[in-house]
C-alpha cells in the first residue's frame, strides 16, 4: 500500500518533467544567477542558537493530514509578523497539490523581510535546486526518507554550487547515519513520520543525542509551547521549525514572541 510520501513523490516527478519541458534548465540557471545573493541561512541559525533559540517560522496554508490550516493567508503580512516576533529564518511551502503552496509565496515572503528563507518542498532533481535559487531561496530541504544517498549528494552539491545551505531532514537512526555522510551542518529531526504523518517528540529525544557535535540540530513538527522547546533543548536541540501551531493563531507576531519566551540556557542538558 502506498504511503503519503509515495504519492507525493509520484506527482512530484511528473511535475518536474512538466516544468523541464516548459522551462529549459538554461533559463532557470540564468534566473538563478540573476537572483539576489543568499542571506546565510545556517549562519543565522548558528548565531541565534549561541545565545537562545533559532526559529525557522513556517508559512504553510494547508497540509495532507490537517487540510486547510489558515484561511486568511497574506504571505507578506505573515512574513513580517514572523520577523517582528523574533523568527530567525522563514520556511515557505511551495508544493501545490498537498500543501496549497506556490512558488510565488517564496518570492513574496523574501521580498517582504530580511530573513533567510528555506524553500520547503520535495526535491528529487538538481533542476529544482536551480529553481529554488531562482526563486530567491537561501536554503533547500533534503528529505532522507524520500531520496537515495546518491540523490542526496547530488542535491547537496547543487545547493553548494548556488551558494545555498541545506537542511537535511531525518526521522530515524538509519536516516541520521546516512545524513552524516553529507557535508551539511544542519540536521533537521522531523517528529512527524512522513509515511503515517503521526507526530511524537520522542523522535527528537532519541536522535538528538546521536547527532555529531559539529552539526546543528533543528527539531521539526509537533511544537506548540515554550515548554516543548525547553524540553527538547535539554536534549541538544537549539533550533526549531514551527509552522502549524503559529499559523493557527490570530496574532502570529504575538504567538511567535510567546513561543520564544524564556529560552533554556545553553548549559541545560541531560
Curated annotation (Swiss-Prot):
Entry keyword Lyase: yes
Catalysed transformations (reactions): 1-(2-carboxyphenylamino)-1-deoxy-D-ribulose 5-phosphate + H(+) = (1S,2R)-1-C-(indol-3-yl)glycerol 3-phosphate + CO2 + H2O
Signal sequence, start to end: none
Pathway stated in the Swiss-Prot or TrEMBL entry: Amino-acid biosynthesis; L-tryptophan biosynthesis; L-tryptophan from chorismate: step 4/5
Protein name (record): Indole-3-glycerol phosphate synthase
Record NCBIfam families: PRK00278.1-2 (NF001370), PRK00278.1-6 (NF001373), PRK00278.2-4 (NF001377)
SUPFAM superfamilies per record: Ribulose-phoshate binding barrel
Domain of life from the UniProt record: Bacteria
Family, per entry: Belongs to the TrpC family.
Record keywords: Amino-acid biosynthesis, Aromatic amino acid biosynthesis, Decarboxylase, Lyase, Tryptophan biosynthesis
PROSITE patterns in the record: IGPS
Sample GO molecular function, one term: indole-3-glycerol-phosphate synthase activity
Pfam families in the record: IGPS
BP terms from Gene Ontology: L-tryptophan biosynthetic process
Enzyme class: lyase
CDD domains cross-referenced by the UniProt entry: IGPS
UniProt-listed Enzyme Commission number(s): 4.1.1.48
Organism: Cereibacter sphaeroides (strain KD131 / KCTC 12085) (Rhodobacter sphaeroides)
InterPro entries the UniProt entry points to: Aldolase_TIM (IPR013785), Indole-3-glycerol_P_synth (IPR045186), Indole-3-glycerol_P_synth_dom (IPR013798), Indole-3-GlycerolPSynthase_CS (IPR001468), RibuloseP-bd_barrel (IPR011060)
Amino acid at each position: 500500500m502506498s504511503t503519503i510520501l509515495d504519492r507525493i513523490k509520484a506527482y512530484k516527478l511528473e511535475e518536474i518533467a512538466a516544468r523541464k519541458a516548459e522551462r529549459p534548465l538554461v533559463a532557470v540557471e540564468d534566473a538563478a544567477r540573476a537572483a539576489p545573493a543568499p542571506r546565510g541561512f545556517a549562519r543565522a541559525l548558528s548565531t541565534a542558537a549561541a545565545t537562545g533559540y533559532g526559529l525557522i517560522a513556517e508559512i504553510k496554508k494547508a497540509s495532507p493530514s490537517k487540510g486547510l490550516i489558515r484561511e486568511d493567508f497574506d504571505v507578506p503580512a505573515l512574513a513580517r509578523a514572523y520577523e517582528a516576533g523574533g523568527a530567525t529564518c522563514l520556511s515557505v511551502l511551495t508544493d501545490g497539490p498537498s500543501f496549497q503552496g506556490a512558488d510565488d509565496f517564496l518570492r513574496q515572503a523574501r521580498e517582504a523581510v530580511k530573513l533567510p528563507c528555506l524553500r520547503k518542498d520535495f526535491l528529487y532533481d538538481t533542476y529544482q535546486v536551480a529553481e529554488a535559487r531562482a526563486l530567491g531561496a537561501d536554503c533547500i530541504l533534503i528529505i532522507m526518507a524520500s531520496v537515495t544517498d546518491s540523490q542526496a549528494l547530488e542535491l547537496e552539491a547543487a545547493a553548494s554550487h548556488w551558494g545555498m545551505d541545506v537542511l537535511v531532514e531525518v526521522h530515524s537512526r538509519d536516516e541520521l547515519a546516512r545524513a552524516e555522510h553529507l557535508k551539511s551542518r544542519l540536521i533537521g529531526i522531523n517528529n512527524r513520520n512522513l509515511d503515517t504523518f503521526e507526530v511524537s517528540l520522542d523522535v527528537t529525544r532519541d536522535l538528538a543525542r546521536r547527532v555529531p557535535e559539529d552539526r546543528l540540530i533543528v527539531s521539526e513538527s509537533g511544537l506548540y509551547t515554550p515548554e516543548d522547546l525547553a524540553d527538547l533543548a535539554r536534549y541538544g536541540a537549539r533550533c526549531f521549525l514551527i509552522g502549524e501551531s503559529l499559523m493557527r493563531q490570530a496574532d502570529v507576531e504575538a504567538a511567535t514572541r510567546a513561543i520564544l519566551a524564556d529560552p533554556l540556557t545553553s548549559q541545560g542538558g541531560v
